[in-house]
Amino acid sequence: MTATTNMFVLGAAGTSGVQWGTIIVTLVTFLILLALLKKFAWGPLKDVMDKREHDINKDIDDAEQAKLNAQKLEEQNKQTLKETQDEVQKILEESKVQARKQHEEIIHEANIRANGMIETAQNEINSEKERAIADINNQVSELSVLIASKVLQKEISDKDQKALVEKYIKEAGDK
């Protein structure tokens, strides 16, 4: 059995040694096959793999750029939101200040009107008081003249009457 195995291993029955022709043909065939594989299979396969690698790298770069853009947009949105909130706060503060000013103006105008009404009322009261005093003075003078004329039993002149009235008014005012 070992002889049969040796025969198959060595290549053919009855030959001895290495068959260089077969080895060279096999080697040349193998090299041709490698060259054909490189040209028709390995080259296009490598091109496809290189293109795929390029596409993947491009997609990764695009994704990173999109991420950066998204971060920038998020920062811009945060900044815009902050500016908007600041502006709203400023408007609210201005509104409060304006409301306080209007409140103070309304109170001031109301005080001015009230003071004007009080002054008008006081002026009217003083006018009425002066009229009442003048009426009382006229009545007193008429009564004084009447009493004096009855006491003296004579009529006095208008000039004398005025002098007497002024004298009595002065005396009444001093008391």
UniProtKB/Swiss-Prot annotation:
Pfam families reported in the protein's UniProt record: ATP-synt_B (PF00430)
Organism this protein belongs to: Staphylococcus saprophyticus subsp. saprophyticus (strain ATCC 15305 / DSM 20229 / NCIMB 8711 / NCTC 7292 / S-41)
Assembly and oligomerization: F-type ATPases have 2 components, F(1) - the catalytic core - and F(0) - the membrane proton channel. F(1) has five subunits: alpha(3), beta(3), gamma(1), delta(1), epsilon(1). F(0) has three main subunits: a(1), b(2) and c(10-14). The alpha and beta chains form an alternating ring which encloses part of the gamma chain. F(1) is attached to F(0) by a central stalk formed by the gamma and epsilon chains, while a peripheral stalk is formed by the delta and b chains.
Name of the encoding gene: atpF
Residue stretches in coiled coil: none
Membrane topology term: Single-pass membrane protein
Main location: membrane
Family to which the UniProt record says this protein belongs: Belongs to the ATPase B chain family.
Functional note: F(1)F(0) ATP synthase produces ATP from ADP in the presence of a proton or sodium gradient. F-type ATPases consist of two structural domains, F(1) containing the extramembraneous catalytic core and F(0) containing the membrane proton channel, linked together by a central stalk and a peripheral stalk. During catalysis, ATP synthesis in the catalytic domain of F(1) is coupled via a rotary mechanism of the central stalk subunits to proton translocation. Component of the F(0) channel, it forms part of the peripheral stalk, linking F(1) to F(0).
UniProt protein name: ATP synthase subunit b
Molecular function per GO: proton-transporting ATP synthase activity, rotational mechanism; proton-transporting ATPase activity, rotational mechanism
HAMAP family: ATP_synth_b_bprime
Keywords noted in UniProt: ATP synthesis, Cell membrane, CF(0), Hydrogen ion transport, Ion transport, Membrane, Transmembrane, Transmembrane helix, Transport
GO annotations of cellular component type: plasma membrane; proton-transporting ATP synthase complex
